[in-house]
């Protein structure tokens, strides 16, 4: 060895351990790496669809599959809910498989990464335990010498804190299928809740999916700016608000079908309309009868006058004949 100093015996083990992404003692960050630059214009990060609520504490894997050797760099970009202003990145050279930058796996609970070259396609994966501190968005990013391209974004939620008012009783319902912008879970029947007590006039309930690790979410909630849009959009369309809309539609339907029993004012208005119509009909009938009676009386008087005139004429003719006979 030429009298040189031998490397420590633990260095190969450390290097092997680092290759699997369990330590952040990797190569220094490549500041000029396109995958570390903000994704702008038409290549900006895509809005994540269908945030998923998965079993709390279970290990899961986020995998990005890329065309082989089409892009020199591949990356997984991480935005955690608790630290949305901090971006963690795992950047790998797609040609050599060497890590260029990694501040993601060591800051994520149980984080491990792996890069696989399958010939036609390459696969970069990041596995970790899903807990409150690891919830967030995981974006697959491609990079070359000029720009970067976000291909897919996965949003993961570990638990949901629901503050309920005392005058409302709502059951938060999650769907079993992916719906854009709304939180969903593959198995809604496994949904459980933790009663965290009262905060003023509101009741805090934490919803989660039990995992095999036995870990439970905490009732203490810090500021989670990144996860708030996912959760609030889901709660805005939850079972409670749907029930209110259905009840309102049902009330309007019964109002149209049976307004007599539903609203006394509408019944009184209808009765008044019927009474007014009947009165108008009676007045019209009285007027028509009066007019007919008046016409009948006039006709009778005219007939009597005609008959009297004829009788007078006959009498006058008879008198004139008698006078002629006497002469």
Swiss-Prot record:
**In its keyword annotation, does this UniProt entry include Membrane?**
yes
InterPro entries per record: UL141, UL141-like_sf
Q: Which residues cross the membrane?
A: 266-285
Task: Tell me a GO cellular component.
Answer: host cell membrane
User: What top-level branch of life does the organism fall under?
Assistant: Viruses
Q: How does it sit in the membrane?
A: Single-pass membrane protein
Keywords, sorted A to Z:
Host membrane, Membrane, Transmembrane, Transmembrane helix
Q: What is its main location?
A: host cell
Region annotation Disordered: residue ranges? 297-327
- Subcellular compartments: Host membrane
Q: Where is the composition biased (Low complexity)?
A: 305-319
Does the UniProt entry include the keyword Ribosomal protein?
no
Q: Which Pfam families match?
A: UL141 (PF16758)
State the similarity comment.
Belongs to the HHV-5 UL14 protein family.
What protein is this chain from?
Answer: Uncharacterized protein UL14
């Amino acid at each position: 060895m030429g009298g040189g100093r031998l490397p420590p015996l633990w260095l190969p083990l450390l290097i092997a351990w680092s290759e699997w992404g369990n330590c952040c003692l990797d190569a220094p960050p490549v500041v000029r790496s396109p995958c570390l630059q903000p994704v702008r214009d038409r290549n900006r990060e895509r809005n994540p669809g269908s945030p998923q609520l998965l079993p709390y504490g279970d290990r899961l894997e986020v995998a990005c599959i890329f065309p082989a050797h089409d892009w020199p760099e591949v990356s997984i970009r991480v935005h955690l809910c608790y630290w949305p202003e901090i971006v963690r990145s795992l950047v790998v050279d797609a040609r050599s498989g060497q890590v260029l930058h990694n501040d993601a796996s060591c800051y994520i609970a149980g984080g491990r990464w792996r890069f696989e070259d399958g010939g036609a396609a390459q696969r970069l994966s990041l596995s970790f335990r899903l807990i409150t501190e690891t919830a967030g968005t995981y974006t697959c990013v491609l990079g070359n010498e000029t720009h970067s391209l976000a291909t897919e974004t996965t949003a993961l939620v570990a638990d949901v804190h629901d503050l309920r008012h005392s005058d409302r009783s709502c059951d938060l319902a999650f769907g079993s299928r992916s719906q854009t912008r709304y939180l969903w879970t593959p198995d809604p029947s496994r949904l459980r809740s933790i009663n965290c007590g009262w905060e003023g006039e509101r009741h805090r309930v934490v919803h989660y999916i039990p995992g095999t690790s036995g870990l439970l979410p905490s009732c203490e909630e810090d500021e989670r700016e990144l996860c708030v849009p996912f959760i609030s959009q889901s709660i805005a369309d939850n079972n409670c608000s749907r029930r209110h809309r259905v009840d309102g539609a049902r009330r309007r339907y019964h109002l149209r079908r049976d307004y007599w029993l539903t609203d006394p004012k509408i019944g009184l208005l209808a009765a008044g309309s019927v009474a007014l119509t009947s009165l108008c009909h009676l007045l019209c009938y009285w007027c028509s009868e009066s007019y007919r009676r008046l016409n009948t009386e006039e006709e009778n008087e005219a007939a009597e006058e005609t008959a009297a005139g004829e009788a007078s004429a006959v009498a006058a003719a008879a008198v004139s004949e008698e006078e002629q006979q006497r002469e």
